[in-house]
C-alpha cells in the first residue's frame, strides 16, 4: 500500500510540474496581468496537485524510512521527461533516455527494491 501511495506522490508532483508548464504556455498565448496569472486555472490546478502530493508525502514519511522513500522521488525526473515529450512535443535526446534508465535503476537500488 505504501509503495502505491509513493507512486501517487510521484504522479501528483509530476502533474504539478506539467500544469505549471501549461500555465506558462497559456500566458504566452494570451498576455495577462500578474493577478490573472496568479489565479489562472492551470496554476491553481498545479498548486492543488503539488499541495496534495506534499500532504501525502508527509503521511508517507511517518510510515517509510526516508532513505527508502526519497530515492523513489527521482522517478519524477523520468516522468517529467516522458510528459514533456508526450504533452509538449519536446525533443528528447538519446542521452536523455539513457540518463532516465540510469535514474530508474539507481532509484530502485537506493530504495532497496532491486
UniProtKB/Swiss-Prot annotation:
Short name of one Pfam family: EamA
Associated pathway: Bacterial outer membrane biogenesis; lipopolysaccharide biosynthesis
Keywords: Cell inner membrane, Cell membrane, Lipid A biosynthesis, Lipid biosynthesis, Lipid metabolism, Lipopolysaccharide biosynthesis, Membrane, Transmembrane, Transmembrane helix, Transport
InterPro entries, A to Z: EamA_dom, Flippase_ArnE, Small_drug/metabolite_transptr
UniProt membrane topology term: Multi-pass membrane protein
Key word Lipid metabolism present: yes
Cysteines engaged in disulfide bonds, as pairs: none
GO biological processes: lipid A biosynthetic process; lipopolysaccharide biosynthetic process
Keyword Nucleus on entry: no
Compartments, record wording: Cell inner membrane
Top-rank taxon: Bacteria
A GO MF term: carbohydrate derivative transmembrane transporter activity
Domain EamA per the UniProt entry, residue ranges: 53-112
Membrane-crossing residue ranges in chain numbering: 41-61, 64-84, 94-114
GO cellular component, one term: plasma membrane
Subunit structure: Heterodimer of ArnE and ArnF.
Entries under HAMAP family matching the protein: Flippase_ArnE
Annotated PANTHER family: 4-AMINO-4-DEOXY-L-ARABINOSE-PHOSPHOUNDECAPRENOL FLIPPASE SUBUNIT ARNE-RELATED, SMR FAMILY PROTON-DEPENDENT DRUG EFFLUX TRANSPORTER SUGE
Function, in words: Translocates 4-amino-4-deoxy-L-arabinose-phosphoundecaprenol (alpha-L-Ara4N-phosphoundecaprenol) from the cytoplasmic to the periplasmic side of the inner membrane.
Similarity field: Belongs to the ArnE family.
Protein's name according to its UniProt entry: Probable 4-amino-4-deoxy-L-arabinose-phosphoundecaprenol flippase subunit ArnE
Originating organism: Aeromonas salmonicida (strain A449)
Amino acid at each position: 500500500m505504501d509503495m502505491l501511495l509513493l507512486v501517487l506522490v510521484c504522479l501528483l508532483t509530476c502533474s504539478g510540474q506539467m500544469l505549471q508548464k501549461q500555465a506558462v504556455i497559456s500566458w504566452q498565448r494570451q498576455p495577462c496581468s500578474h493577478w490573472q496569472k496568479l489565479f489562472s486555472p492551470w496554476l491553481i490546478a498545479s498548486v492543488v496537485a503539488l499541495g496534495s502530493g506534499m500532504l501525502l508525502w508527509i503521511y508517507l514519511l511517518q510510515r517509510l524510512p526516508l532513505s527508502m522513500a526519497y530515492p523513489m522521488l527521482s522517478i519524477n525526473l523520468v516522468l517529467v521527461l516522458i510528459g514533456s515529450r508526450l504533452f509538449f512535443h519536446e525533443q528528447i535526446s538519446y542521452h536523455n533516455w539513457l540518463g532516465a534508465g540510469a535514474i530508474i535503476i539507481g532509484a530502485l537500488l537506493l530504495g532497496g527494491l532491486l
